[in-house]
Amino acid sequence: MASLRDLKRQIQSVKNIAKVTDALQAVSAVKFRKAEARVKQARPYAENMEEVMRAIASKASTRNPMLAGREQVRRVAVATLTSDRGLCGSFNAQVLRRTVRFREQQGAEALQVASGRKGIAFFRFRRIGLAESYSGFTDDPSYEDAQRIGRGLTRLFEREEADEVYLVYNRFVNPAVQRPVVVRLLPAAPEGGEEGEGGTVSGAPFDFIPDADTILRRLIPQYVETLVWQALLESAAGEHGARMTAMKNATDNANELVDTLTLQMNKARQAQITREISEIAAGAEALAAG
């Protein structure tokens, strides 16, 4: 059994750790509430953008490769969103596992793009070359960050460096659950956007001037940026939720460990007192007998 001094030292160390994790939990809780509100505000915009894309795509020709795709897919670009910082449980591990699995499933060569220092470090450790990398904003992204990433991914497609572009990120469900998903950005084909569905947005018919193809050429890059923006917000909310949950669990575990160590210390102190009393009693008996 450890000595009383060692137990006291361990208890103090664990208490110090609990203070740190509790503070991190409080900070993450504040950031999480802000990030969650941004996700809820941005979702309707992203959904409306998809409605507009469906309406225009239904009226456009299929000659535009950014909409219809290319005949042969030789290379795909895979953009993965991770966090800049750790202490967020399995948040990064699960999206990176999903990325590796998706890359292995592709019949074409995979071109990797990474956002977040954790993802960048992961791919460099595995010696996977990065076509582009972004960092320094994952916990509080701006629309300008989404534009940089979106424009970079669009350039890869326009220059024919990639024939398809995919985005892998953690979709926010709740503070304890983030679901890794794969979304195709280019060719841009929103669900339900097949030709012949009619040019309507929320039931309202539209005429496109000068024509749907011209509008589509200008809208697709903005559509990609919108999807990236939504993904960045979802990932940020998931990161703060995961960190808040992880720090709460760490604090709870630390408090339980303090209770366990305190019980051990009390038992050790009781044993020491009992031993000292026994020694005093034995000494008294020896003196009386002498």
From Swiss-Prot:
NCBIfam families per UniProt? ATPsyn_F1gamma
Q: What does this protein do?
A: Produces ATP from ADP in the presence of a proton gradient across the membrane. The gamma chain is believed to be important in regulating ATPase activity and the flow of protons through the CF(0) complex.
Q: Quote any Pfam family the record assigns.
A: ATP-synt
Protein name as it appears in the record:
ATP synthase gamma chain
Keyword Ion transport recorded: yes
The family this protein is said to belong to: Belongs to the ATPase gamma chain family.
InterPro entries registered for this protein in UniProt: ATP_synth_F1_ATPase_gsu (IPR035968), ATP_synth_F1_gsu (IPR000131), ATP_synth_F1_gsu_CS (IPR023632)
Keyword Membrane listed: yes
HAMAP family in UniProt: ATP_synth_gamma_bact
The record's subunit annotation is: F-type ATPases have 2 components, CF(1) - the catalytic core - and CF(0) - the membrane proton channel. CF(1) has five subunits: alpha(3), beta(3), gamma(1), delta(1), epsilon(1). CF(0) has three main subunits: a, b and c.
Q: List the PROSITE patterns.
A: ATPASE_GAMMA
Task: Offer an example of a GO molecular function term for this protein.
Answer: ATP binding
